[in-house]
Amino acid sequence: MKMMALALPLLLTLPVAAQSVPPSGTDPWKALTFLEGTWEAKATGSAGVVAMGTYTFRTELGNHILARHSTNGAGCKGPATFDCDHGDLLYVFQDVPGQPLKAVYFDNEGHVIHYDVSTPDATTALFLSDSSQPGPQFRLLYELKGATMSGKFQMRMPGQSDWKSYLEWSGAKRPQN
């Protein structure tokens, strides 16, 4: 159940493809601009979890990172072991100019996930953790289809080839004030 709590805001806020390496001297965030803004999210997951919330992607720290902040709404339902007050942050950054983007996820339960970031197409962002680390491998996918952002937080256990969705979500972009 703690893993569900780990994943909920990750999906509320908030895949394997070739790494997108931005040419040196270009805007590293150009391929991810479709993520920017505040998005509504209705998430469903294993063990009967249903949650509503929002997440915002925006550049911060002088345009050096792309940050995702999430909030849970009042409509969270799940088993007693599920943390409806979960909080997390996702930071996307370019470690070395001209190299693929990286991301790091933190939450209030002490989980940390490091991701490689790629953009298989103009409306898809794929966050993939290192499969050589102990434990499950994680995949976070954002896809913009029309005016709806959808996504999945998935896990693959060591020795397995199939990804299992832990949470899935979708929602529209909120109008800017």
What name fits each language-model region?
Residues 19-177:
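Hydrophobic small-molecule pocket/channel-lining residues, especially in calycin-type beta-barrels
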